[in-house]
Amino acid sequence: MFNAPRGVFLFAMKYIIMCGGTYRRWDTPRQLTRIKGEPIVARTIRLLREAGIEDIAITSDHAAFERFGVSVLHFENLFDVYGADNCSGVWCNGFYPTDEPVTYLFGDVVFSPAAIRTIIDTWTDDVMFFASAPPFAKEYRKPYAEPFGFKVVNQKHFREAIERCKKLDVEGRFNRRPIAWELWQVVSGGVLNMIDYTNYIGINDYTCDIDNPEDIRFFVTGEFL
């Protein structure tokens, strides 16, 4: 893995913004939450286009995502969060299946332009993971790290890791239902149930996802956007 020179694309890659699943605490999909008048998913699309990316798609079965000027890949995602720590379905099934190189971006993340640039410029011939990492930037919202996405060139490796992650879940090998961190532990061959903050690309600015109204207020009132 290394950073490519600015503006150099080593291979054609699609960017998929993941907007599936159900979060019952939200009246509408939280990827549609407006930050200073702009839906989060629209902001991500805009930042990608400003950085020179045109092959962009959204995965969702919700009709509201048809209006953003990019392809919508209709893909059933039965992951359902219905409480603070309660969920059903399999989170790892949310990645649109394809043999092509794809960068999967989580749709509820408020990305900075620099974060998008870092993701674009990171080269890999396998799979790379992006998340925040301590020590956190002063403008970062949360006291813990959050995941932002995966860049996948070796889809075979990635799909095998997803299936292994699901198998380990059934076997009770995880301390919780597996999400991005657990999937990355399997992809990278790391220790299960332990976050290694050194084996992925850390993005340390205000980039973060939204989980509750306080997160929204943080971004709406922040002067850094």
Spans of features found by a protein language model:
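Short, polar loop motifs at secondary-structure junctions
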Residues: 59-65
